[in-house]
């Protein structure tokens, strides 16, 4: 198995292990983060009814305007700020952070810190 396949398998194992423990509710939804080489995505998910309450990504025009590249830390900070604003608009202050098996480093850390700076607590 190649090293890239091993990294992906290890991330998926971490994702499954954490998903067994983390549950989002309507009062405290799960802030799910996913990243690719070019984009980063964030969703607020209520696991009791399986609904997405809010979403933000670098695919949105409001986030990607002014960015030369959407796969960097600057883009992740804008996504974190956008998801925090959408959550506060729906009167959601507390979330459960789900890093989706990714290491808390780089873009994931930047998104989380930007969300905290803009009013979310986790």
UniProtKB/Swiss-Prot annotation:
One of its GO terms (biological process) is translation. GO terms for molecular function: 5S rRNA binding; structural constituent of ribosome. Keywords: Ribonucleoprotein, Ribosomal protein, RNA-binding, rRNA-binding. GO terms for cellular component: cytosolic large ribosomal subunit. Part of the 50S ribosomal subunit; part of the 5S rRNA/L5/L18/L25 subcomplex. Contacts the 5S and 23S rRNAs. Belongs to the universal ribosomal protein uL18 family. This is one of the proteins that bind and probably mediate the attachment of the 5S RNA into the large ribosomal subunit, where it forms part of the central protuberance. This is Large ribosomal subunit protein uL18. The lineage of its organism: Bacteria, Pseudomonadati, Thermodesulfobacteriota, Desulfuromonadia, Geobacterales. The gene is rplR.
